[in-house]
Amino acid sequence: GEWWEKYRPFAVIFWSLLFIIPFAVKYGAGTAAETVLECLVNDYLTFIVLLFGLFCVAGNITVEGSLVGSPRVNVILLGIGTFLSSWIGTTGASMLLVRPVIKMNSWRRNKAHIMVFFIFLISNMGGSLTPIGDPPLLMGFSRGIPFFWSIRFFPILLLNMIILLTVLYFLDKRAYRKDIAAGYMPEIKENEPLIRFEGLHNIIFIVIIVAAVILSGVLPDVPFFQNAAGEVISIPIFGEVKLAITSLIEVVMILLAAFLSFKTTNAEIRKKNHFTWGAIQEVAVLFIGIFITMQPALMILKSAGAELGLTHPSQMFWVTGALSSFLDNTPTYLVFLTTAGSMGF
């Protein structure tokens, strides 16, 4: 609420210091600084820059038209948005489609269920096919998991889409009939096309962002970016903390795409999208704290993960699912990826 909006930076600082100070006392200020900088430079930086880039570019594309919210239209739009999430991110797809979905269903009385399914499909499970789609997969990609590895989830995604969209269709059909029976009727716009896009040139910048992420996994194997020892050329930050030149290239490409998107797009499009910086600011502040405070768990699991008694991947599946229901899925993913690695899964 209002308290969080006003004091969230202080809350993040408090919880971060709750880890940093005892850790510094036990292991030394230098080790504490290296630990914090390591996660911020090599995890948080690429994570937040990618979200920022997709947030900016998606905010410069608008969808207009005379589509009327009906069961069939809602199912089709949410289905398209689900697949779109894996390529422009769940945040980007949600930004792009939430306003059109709300607008085309504005004439209806019974419509709350539509946004629930929107969140299920577009804002969550839709990002499961690529590291662009969802931050946990991006963290896995940065740790060596191939970019297209998660494409194998497509049959699972498709099955869940069919189930959810079928449920949505019948729920929405029932609600739609109630609205019509109660006298609610949509406004018909005769001189307006069914659907109209503005700012479509921003697709170029989305492609640049996707290319930047893919290149961050390809360039480290190119000899040009390696030193004499065969290691990726890096920029020293502090102690043992280094920023790989390939990560810097990724960050620069994404920020350049975001900058060019703003420079080449009419500001009226952002006004139509009610574009503000509030959402990305909140994510940026919150995840600094998340990345820092999950370091103790990652360290413990690296050294003692095999002692947890987990002997099969299915056990991790159920535990991660349970934890992700009330924790963010990114730290949950990282914790159990580390656990699985320590156990040789």
Task: Show where each model-derived region lies.
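Hydrophobic core segments of alpha-helical transmembrane domains in multi-pass membrane transport
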Residues: 13-25, 51-59, 81, 158-170, ...
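Helix-loop-helix module between adjacent transmembrane segments
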Residues: 55-65, 80-93, 122-130, 157-168, ...
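Transmembrane alpha-helix boundary signature
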Residues: 20-40, 55-69, 83-96, 296-304, ...
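C-terminal ends of transmembrane helices
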Residues: 1-3, 54-69, 102-105, 170-174, ...
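Juxtamembrane and boundary regions of transmembrane helices in multi-pass small-molecule transporters
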Residues: 109-110, 129-130, 139, 148-197
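Membrane-interfacial helix-loop connectors
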Residues: 21-24, 85, 95-110, 114-116, ...
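Interfacial loop-to-helix junctions that mark the boundaries of transmembrane helices
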Residues: 2-10, 31-45, 147-156, 193-197, ...
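Transmembrane helical segments that form the transport core of multi-pass membrane transport proteins
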Residues: 206-343
